[in-house]
Regions:
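Glycine-rich phosphate/pyrophosphate-binding beta-alpha loops
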Residues: 56, 144-146, 252-255, 342-356
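Short beta-strand to alpha-helix junction loop
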Residues: 58-69, 93-102, 140-159, 168, ...
Length: 369
């Protein structure tokens, strides 16, 4: 049976574009559908733009494996495509003596995950690196960094186009049905609604992944995990950034905690926190800054009163609710939903940006196999 194209990707965020990039490199004619007017307008545009080392995630998990692999690929890609980035390193800080045992457990996990460039620091060594830091002990992740996420996605889009792929913005996904001879008929909405057939379908739609999977005919409802919206707000401050390195407290259940980063423009930013919400709402309540002061002063006691200014908010597609275990990413193929040629990605939150190129290779391997 002939099809209009080899593969259709739903979602032109970092992960969807990385999937398309991996497929066009393998010779797949690929089209990316994006409901917004430009690429990277969802989860990919409202995050910390941090390149993660891969410290925290359980050994053997998709997050651990694809973060470490993806980070290596990402630095190479950013350098070869002249996308702004900096391997500035990250300090994970124990601010109380009783936290040191947890810090050492993170180091053990990082080593088990194959993370390079890890160094255990005493409090004095950490303060020598970053005067003004409060630390009983710290871990230095030398391979962590920051990047221009939009520049990265623009570079991916350029590679996709150069290899014959296409990105259709303002083109919402309206549903799909499996074809008897294999493949899918994919319906689009919007002003130019149409139907196109493809051998393969990849749903990399971030917050919309569950809804998109639900519009695929015969997709089993029990194979679609619940979606929980994890909102996080960010604050910034004027003046000189206090630290050169990223600074993270010990992680809290379900998140990495409110951390500090210096972006590529030299601006200090703090966040995100975590609030489970019922609807997409990107407003920033200035009152949430009160909790930020208390959290930040645990590792930076000299944060001045009144320094924090509301910045922006993001929403993460979490697969767990408050108090529930923090699960792995879901990258589901026929073994999970029974539909050959379809890959659905659920819960691709942090470190999804870091791992995106490895995620794309993983998805391409599933379809090519």
């Amino acid at each position: 049976m002939t099809h209009d194209t080899d593969a259709i990707i739903i979602g032109a965020g970092a992960v969807g574009l990385a999937c398309a990039y991996a497929l066009v490199q393998r010779g797949f004619e690929t089209i990316v559908l994006e409901k917004e007017k430009a690429i990277g307008q969802g989860v990919s545009s409202r995050n910390s733009e941090v390149i993660h080392g891969g410290l925290y995630y359980p050994s053997g998990s998709l997050k651990a494996r694809l973060c470490v692999e993806g980070r290596r690929k990402l630095y190479d890609f950013l350098a070869s495509h002249h996308v702004a980035h900096e391997m500035c390193g990250k300090l994970v800080v124990a601010t109380e003596p009783h936290e040191i045992e947890r810090l050492d457990a993170i180091l053990d996990q990082a080593v088990a995950n194959g993370v390079e460039g890890m160094q255990r620091l005493t409090g004095a060594e950490a303060r020598a690196l970053e005067p003004g830091l409060r630390a009983e002990a710290a871990l230095l992740s030398q391979t962590s960094g920051v990047m221009d996420a939009h520049g990265y996605m623009d570079a991916l889009a350029g590679e996709i186009s150069a290899r014959g792929g296409a990105i259709a913005v303002n083109t919402p996904f309206a549903g799909a049905r499996p074809l008897e001879g294999g493949g899918f008929a994919i319906r689009t909405g919007g002003d130019h609604a149409t139907e196109v057939t493809a051998r393969h379908l990849v749903i990399a739609a971030g917050l919309d992944a569950q809804a998109a999977a639900g519009t695929v005919e015969t997709y089993p409802a029990d194979a679609i995990p619940p979606l929980h919206l994890g909102k996080g707000v960010y604050f910034t401050m004027a003046g000189r950034a206090p630290f050169r390195h990223l600074v993270y407290p010990l992680p809290i259940p379900g998140a990495l905690g409110t951390h500090y980063r210096r972006d590529l423009g030299g601006q200090a930013r703090f966040g995100p926190d975590l609030e489970f919400v019922a609807n997409e709402d990107y407003s920033v309540d200035p009152a949430r800054g009160e909790a930020f002061y208390a959290t930040i002063r645990r590792f930076w006691p000299d944060l001045p009163d009144g320094a924090l200014v509301p910045d922006y908010a993001g929403i993460r597609p979490k697969l767990h609710g408050p108090g529930e275990p923090h699960p792995d990413w879901r990258i589901d193929g026929a073994g999970q939903h029974g539909m050959k040629g379809l890959v659905t990605l659920f819960g691709i939150e942090s470190p999804g940006l870091t791992g995106s190129l490895a995620i794309g290779e993983h998805v391409a391997g599933m379809l090519a196999g």
